[in-house]
Regions:
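Thiol-/selenol-based redox modules, centered on thioredoxin-like
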Residues: 162-165, 169-217
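Structural microenvironment flanking redox-active thiols in thiol-disulfide oxidoreductases
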Residues: 95-160
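Bacterial N-terminal signal peptides
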Residues: 36-46
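Bacterial N-terminal signal peptides that target proteins for export
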Residues: 13, 21, 25-36
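Loop/turn elements at helix/coil->beta-strand transitions in domains of secreted/extracellular proteins
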Residues: 80-84, 110-115, 143-148, 178, ...
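Low-complexity, intrinsically disordered or signal/transmembrane-proximal segments
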Residues: 5-9, 18
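Amphipathic alpha-helical repeat scaffolds
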Residues: 88-92
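N-terminal "domain-start" segment that seeds a small globular fold
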Residues: 49-77, 97, 162
Length: 217
């Protein structure tokens, strides 16, 4: 009905030579109130939908951690809607070379919606003894890591950080060593975990990532 009204009114206004701004004002003034209300609702709906999507966050991601480089607080809700690979890392481990594979994985899939999140930890073999700055410098200078990294924290034992505490509870699997991996879907649900021996480029990881990237939210 609103469209019909506009279609009837528009040609007449154009015939009379109204400017675009004058035309818009005359149309609005002459519209019945119910049409104005309908027009407002139709205009507001996309913004409401966007706001709802922005504010909705999975409990699994409702945590804030300091960024590794500068300890600026980072809310994990910013990654809602992405496929997420969470990894506990260490600088002096036999699996440290997996940084290279993780960075390649991130570079390959990030434009399709994958993000890798690194959580340095000194829990296993005391293989992450340095400061956050030491770790950040090592990651940058040795592997040119660009995926998000967070300040050193515990990921196992009696006091794991809040994210790993939830990952452990939901999977029933605790990290057994450095470079343990948890895969989270676009809706913020953990769907799988992989041991330290499973390389980032393995088909078990990439196949699952491909599948999750293809799923709609």
């Amino acid at each position: 009905m609103a469209l019909g009204y506009i279609q009837r009114y528009l040609p007449e206004c154009l015939r009379l030579g109204h400017s675009r701004s004058t035309l818009r004002l005359k149309m609005i003034r002459s519209m019945p109130r119910y049409l104005l209300a309908l027009l407002f609702l139709l205009t507001a709906m996309p913004f409401a939908k966007t706001a709802l999507a922005t504010t909705s966050c999975s409990p699994l991601l409702s945590h804030t951690f300091p960024r590794l480089q500068d300890e600026a607080p980072q809310n994990l809700c910013q990654y809602q809607g992405k496929v997420i690979l969470v990894v506990n890392t260490a600088s002096f481990c036999g699996f440290t070379s997996q940084y290279e594979g993780l960075e390649k994985l991130y570079a390959k899939y990030k434009d399709r919606g994958l993000v890798v999140l690194g959580f340095p930890s000194n829990d296993f073999g005391q293989q992450e003894p340095g400061s956050n700055k030491d770790i950040a410098d090592f990651c940058k200078n040795t592997y040119d890591v660009k995926f998000p990294m967070f300040a050193k924290s515990s990921v196992s034992g009696s006091n794991p950080n809040p994210l790993f505490k939830m990952l452990i509870a939901k999977t029933g699997t605790t990290p057994k060593w450095n470079f343990y991996k948890y895969l989270i879907d676009r809706n913020g649900n953990v769907v799988d975990s992989f041991g330290s021996m499973t390389k980032p480029a393995s088909s078990s990881i990439t196949g699952e990532i491909e599948k999750l990237l293809g799923e709609k939210i």
